[in-house]
């Protein structure tokens, strides 16, 4: 039995403008090479673009996009007796949210064009509507989990 106490869960801080933890989680995922001010600028411009295009609350669009992309199950590779099985496992809501943010940003980076805030805003709007590459990624993951349901007992 370990003598160490369990580590406390770190809670995400809220961002300076919207005072929202979800916005800060997205900013930390956009971050490259420690340029946080650039990451904030990209997200805030994307949010402004969403507001101009949809006339809705951009934070609700962001929340809805993340909710739509968040997966319920994922597949993990598990090695049993020399062969590798893709085992479907349920994931917690926080891990699902992290995966959703990662997929949204990956899909927006792959979009054609040069401007990241433009690509991110369009990907968020598409995901909120229920289409886009991030939604496709979620559906693909769910299909993989459904196809490998026979291996669920390997958990």
UniProtKB/Swiss-Prot annotation:
Listed under GO cellular component are:
chloroplast; small ribosomal subunit
Per UniProt, subcellular location reads as:
Plastid, Chloroplast
Q: Fetch the Pfam families from UniProt.
A: Ribosomal_S7
Disulphide bond pairs? none
Protein keywords: Chloroplast, Plastid, Ribonucleoprotein, Ribosomal protein, RNA-binding, rRNA-binding
PROSITE patterns associated with the record: RIBOSOMAL_S7
Domain of life according to the entry: Eukaryota
The record's annotation in Gene3D superfamilies points to: Ribosomal protein S7 domain
Q: What is its main location?
A: plastid
**GO function terms (MF aspect):** rRNA binding; structural constituent of ribosome
Q: Which GO terms describe its biological process?
A: translation
InterPro entries of this UniProt entry? Ribosomal_uS7, Ribosomal_uS7_bac/org-type, Ribosomal_uS7_CS, Ribosomal_uS7_dom, Ribosomal_uS7_dom_sf
Signal peptide coordinates: none
Q: Which family does it belong to?
A: Belongs to the universal ribosomal protein uS7 family.
Q: How does it assemble?
A: Part of the 30S ribosomal subunit.
Quote the function comment for this protein. Answer: One of the primary rRNA binding proteins, it binds directly to 16S rRNA where it nucleates assembly of the head domain of the 30S subunit.
Question: What is the protein name for this chain?
Answer: Small ribosomal subunit protein uS7c
């Amino acid at each position: 039995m370990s003598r160490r106490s369990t580590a406390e869960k770190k809670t995400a801080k809220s961002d300076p403008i919207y005072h929202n933890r979800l916005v800060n989680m997205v900013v930390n995922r956009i971050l490259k090479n420690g340029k946080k001010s650039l990451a904030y600028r990209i997200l805030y411009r994307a949010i402004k673009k969403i507001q101009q295009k949809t006339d809705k609350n951009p934070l609700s669009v962001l929340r809805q996009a993340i909710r739509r992309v968040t997966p319920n199950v994922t597949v993990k590779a598990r090695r049993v007796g020399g062969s590798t099985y893709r085992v479907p496992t349920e994931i917690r809501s926080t891990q699902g949210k992290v995966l959703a943010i990662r997929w949204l940003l990956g899909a927006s980076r792959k979009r054609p064009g040069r401007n990241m805030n433009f690509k991110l805003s369009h990907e968020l709007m598409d995901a909120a509507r229920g289409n886009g590459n991030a939604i496709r990624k979620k559906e693909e993951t769910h299909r993989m989990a459904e196809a490998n349901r026979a291996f669920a007992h390997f958990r």
